A protein has these predicted regions:
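Glycine-rich, mobile lid/loop segments that gate access to catalytic sites or pores
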Residues: 5, 60, 65-180
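Short, ordered loop/turn segments at secondary-structure junctions
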Residues: 6, 29, 45-47, 82-84
Length: 180
């Protein structure tokens, strides 16, 4: 789970595949209708793709549960899934996982590394980076992690990537940076 104590600008790039997993539809809606998000719940093992209305309902349930334990609106919770296509999520395990993770949320190098490892499927090693630098007289940090970089056709198909920053940036500029 990725969480910010304050609402963050949200932007996204999504697969162009005709078949889109429920979390893609959920997150695309958040990016379209909101300037901010505050959490991302990620599961690895089952993609929640080709799961129909039940898959969409599971996105809602996941967001509702995260919102409840984190004290934020469900509309500020993105959901991401990776893994086997066509299987339903074990929603009871997802809910229990959200409950278990919330009090253990942490920041720093070790927490970032653990999160990057947790989203791996067929990856051979975690992919993460964080850089701190000065811009306009202020120190800012940009961090990122991803999985599935070997299977990205068509355009982001099975790849999950997350970028975080404390940089004050407009939604439009953030979206442009992700779309280059």
């Amino acid at each position: 789970m990725i969480y910010s104590q304050v609402p963050c600008r949200v932007a996204g790039t999504f697969t162009t595949n005709l078949v889109k997993a429920a979390p893609v539809l959920w997150d695309r809606d958040i990016v379209k209708n909101s300037d901010y998000a505050q959490a991302v719940v990620v599961n690895a093992g089952i993609a929640n793709a080709c799961t129909g209305q039940e898959g969409l309902d599971y996105c809602q349930k996941t967001a509702d549960q995260a919102a409840k334990v984190l004290g934020i609106p469900a509309s500020a919770v993105c959901v991401a899934s990776t893994g086997v296509i066509g299987k339903q999520l074990p929603i009871d395990r997802i809910m229990a996982g959200v409950d278990a993770l919330a009090p253990k949320l942490a920041d720093g190098v070790e927490a970032g590394n653990a999160a990057a490892k947790a989203i791996m499927t067929t990856d051979t090693h975690e992919k993460e980076v964080a850089v701190t630098f000065e811009i306009g007289g202020k120190t800012v940090t940009i961090g990122g992690m991803c999985k599935g970089s070997g299977m990205i056709h068509p355009n982001m198909c099975t790849m999950l990537a997350f970028v975080t920053t404390d940089l004050a940036i407009s939604k439009e500029l953030l979206q442009e940076a992700l779309s280059v």
